[in-house]
Structure formats: C-alpha cells, structure tokens
UniProtKB/Swiss-Prot annotation:
NCBIfam families: PRK14647.1. It comes from Geotalea uraniireducens (strain Rf4). One of its GO terms (biological process) is ribosomal small subunit assembly. Required for maturation of 30S ribosomal subunits. This is Ribosome maturation factor RimP. InterPro entries: Ribosome_maturation_RimP, RimP_C, RimP_C_sf, RimP_N, RimP_N_sf. The gene is rimP.
Length: 159
C-alpha cells in the first residue's frame, strides 16, 4: 500500500479509536526515521492529555491496526500530546483557540491591513469568519488570512 494510502486509512481508524476515548486526533505523521518507520500521533482533549490517555490510545489503536493489517512493514507507534506549540490544522481550531497567541506561516506573502506583505504572522488569534483567519498582530496591525493560504499555524507560548 502506498504511503499516502496508509496515512489516509490509519487516519480514519485512529480518529474512530481516539474519539471513542473522548479525545481528538490533532496530527499524524508516518515517516522513516533511521532504519524504521514511525507512526506518530498527537492527541488532545479538553484540559489536556496525560500519560494514561496516551497509553490507552496506543493500546487500543495497536489492536485495531493489527487486525486491519494496514501497515505491512515494521513500524513504531508513538502517541503524545501536541505540546505547548500545538498545531492548528482544522477550521474549528482557529475558533477554539481564539484569544491565544499564534504564529501563522502562509504559502505566499500576504498583506496586513497596513499593506505590508509577509509570510509570517505573529499575534492574537481573533477567530475565523467565512474562511478567513483573523489575527491582531503584535506590531499593532491586523491580518485577514484566507484559510487555504495557511501553510502552518501553531499556538505560541507566552512567557
């Protein structure tokens, strides 16, 4: 099975298992590290996840993956929290984390409300409206970033 197909199939199975445990799948990676493949899942829930949550996901998902036989080669399964710099992947994430400090990178330079073009936006997430991510930038400007132009977005930790 091609890597893209493996990722797609594992994502469906993982979302079913993880949601049944009251958590959400934040991100999934399947890549070669050294000599072996690593399937890495990042999970979260309201209030955050702990070691027992990660162990439960690992146990449950391992059983499902063994039965479904999705991955034919040897791999390691890792389950963890997304960390303090949690990625924002879904439209819902941009609403859920409204008011938090975010760093957004875009595929191409986009203007802020002062006309300054940039690819990196750092500021307070104001939400998402009609597919446009709204950010109050640290420098005082505002930015309206079309969701489809977001290459990468993460929460930023404030000291």
């Amino acid at each position: 099975m091609a890597k893209v197909d493996v990722i797609s199939r594992v994502t469906v199975l993982a979302e079913q298992v993880i949601s049944s445990l009251g958590m959400e799948l934040v991100d999934l990676e399947y890549k070669r590290e050294g000599r072996e493949m690593v399937l890495r899942l990042f999970v979260d829930k309201e209030g955050g996840v702990n070691l027992d949550d990660c162990a439960s996901v690992s146990r449950e998902l391992s059983e499902v993956l063994d039965v479904e036989d999705v991955i034919s080669e040897h791999y390691s399964l890792e389950v963890s929290s997304p960390g303090i710099d949690r990625p924002l992947k879904k439209v819902e994430d941009f609403q859920r984390f409204k008011g938090r400090l975010v760093k957004i990178r875009t595929f191409e330079p986009l203007p802020d409300d002062a006309g300054n073009k940039r690819k990196t936006f750092l500021g307070e997430l104001k939400g998402i409206e009609n597919g446009v991510v709204l950010v109050a930038l640290k420098e005082g400007q505002n930015a309206a970033i079309p969701f489809e132009k977001v290459a990468k977005a993460n929460l930023e930790f404030e000291f």
